[in-house]
C-alpha cells in the first residue's frame, strides 16, 4: 500500500517596524521572506488530480506565522485552485481510495490537530475525529471505510486538575505520553456518531504504520519511549484492525517505516543491520508477515533510504534518498540488484506521491534558479510536466548563479560543495566570501531554490556582492556511509580542512578576496563556526547559530544525550581529552573574531546555555560579540519575523566587520 505525504527572547529586537511589503529592486531578506513553501503532493488514485500544500508567511501586525492551505491541480495542467480556506493551517491531504474524499489535518475550531474530510470539488469540510491530545499521523483503510491514526495519551482528569491547581511538578523520564494506534469509521453509526477504537496500549511509542491490503491488519513501528534519544530501540509489530493482541514482527532494533506489499504477504521496512550509529544507515529489508528472518533487498547509494511504498505489481520498492547534491526518487527490485533512478536530471526532487496503479507520479522539483513546482510524469519514462505556478507573484530579480564545485582536502579526500556567485558577477573581480556550514553533521547542501527564505538568505547575500560557499564536508549525507562516518572522533579537524580547502580554492581562482572572509552556520554548522574561529584569524566576522560550543555540557543538557558519546567513543568522564580537544569553549582563549550568536530560547536540541557560554567567554576577552535570543523558538526559527530579523542581522554584521560598513542600519 502507498501512503501519500511529503518527503532539523531577543535581547533587543529592532527594525521590525519596517514594512516587509516594500518593493525592493534586488534580493533582500524582505523580498525573500514572501516566499511560499510548497510542502508536498498527494496524487489521486486515478492519477488525474494532485492535491498539494502551500505554506504562506503572515507578518501583518501581531502575526508572525506560516499558514498552510491545500490546493488542487489537474494532472493535465488545465486547472489549479485553492481547496481549503480559513485562519488555521490545513495540511497532509490524503485521498480516499475511491477518490471521492480528501482527508486532511487541521486545528480548526480548537488548538489540537484533528482529521477533517472534504469533497475535492466543493462542499464544506467535516470534522472526523475529536482527538483530545491531537492527531499525529493518519491513513485510509484500503476499502475507504476507516481511517487509522496515532494520538498521544491525553492528560488524565487528575493531571488536568493538578495543572489548574499548580500542583504540576514534572518528574523527568516518567509518565510518558505514548502515542498509540486508533481507528475511526468514516460513516456514522445509527446514532449519528463516530467513535474511535483504540488498537494499542502499553509502554511503547508508535511511529509510522500501514494498512494490509485486506483491511485486516496494521503494521507499525514503535520505540521504547517518545524521547528522541530512544530511536535505536525501534521495533515492528502487527495488530488486528478490529482489535486484538499485538504480534511482534521484527524484533531487531532500529527497524522502522513499514509498508505492506500489494499481496499482503510481505512487509518492507528500513533497518540498519545492527550497525546502529547516529551517523546512521538505513537499508531496505523485507520480511514475511508469518515471521522469519528479514532479507536485505540491496544496496542503495547513500544507505539512507526513506521507503515510499511498493509498485502495484509488487516487484519494486520505491524510496527517496540524496545522491550527492540531489535528493531523488529511486526504485529497487525486491529480488535484488541495483536501484534505478526514477527522477532524472539536475536539481532537487521531493514530496512525491504515486497513483494507485503506480503508473503516474507527482513530484516537487526545483533547481537553484528555478522555483519549486509540482510536476506530473509517467513512471515508464520520466518526462515531468509542470502543473502549478506557486509563488507566481514572487520577485523575479536577477539571481546569483549557483554551481557544484569539487576540491581535494588536505588528506586527498574529494569534497563537493555549492558556490553561489554575486549577482552580475565579474570574473576579474575578487569578492568577499561567506562560508556557510550545514547542520547535522549528517546534513547536506542540495540543489534547491536559492531564493527561498531560510535562516541564511543566499540571494540577498549574492545581491550584496558576497560569494557564498556551502561545502559538504566529511560527515555529510549523500556520499555514502563511509563518508558520513569519516568525522567520527574528529569534529573540527578533518572537516575543518574540507571547509577551508573550498575557501582556498575560490581564493586561488581569484573569486574570493583572502582578506574579506566570513563564516556562519546553524547547529553543527554553529559548532563548526565557533571551532573555526578558535583555530584561525582568517575570518573577519562569524555568526554562530544554535551552535554546540561545549561538548561536555551539551551532552549533559541536550535532549539527545547519546549523540556525542557515539561520535566520540564514550562519555565525557571516559574520554575527557576528546571532549575538551573538540570543544570551542576549551580552546576559546585568544579568539578575536567579531561574532554574532543567534539562539532560540526554547531550544531543547542545543540548549541556549551553549550560546551563553560562548558569549560570556568572548565578552570576557573583549572580543566584539552580540547574543540575540529568540523567544518561543526551538532548534530552528519558526516565525517569519525572526527569520527576517536573522537575515538582516547577518548582513549587517558581515557588512560592518568584513567591509567596514553597516549599510546605515543598527546592529544592536
Identify the function of each model-found stretch.
Residues 42, 58-60, 148-150, 157-159, ...:
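Non-catalytic accessory segments flanking enzyme active sites
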Residues 23-37, 63-65, 72-89, 106, ...:
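Multi-bladed beta-propeller domains
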Residues 45-46, 97-98, 142-143, 213-214, ...:
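Residue-level detector of Asp-centered blade-edge/turn motifs that repeat once per structural unit
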Residues 454-464, 469-668:
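Active-site-proximal cap/loop segments of hydrolase catalytic domains
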Residues 42, 94, 139, 210, ...:
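Conserved beta-strand position repeated across blades of beta-propeller domains
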Residues 429-440:
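Short beta-strand element of the alpha/beta-hydrolase
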Residues 56-60, 108-111, 154-157, 225-227, ...:
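Short glycine/acidic-enriched loop and turn motifs that connect beta-strands
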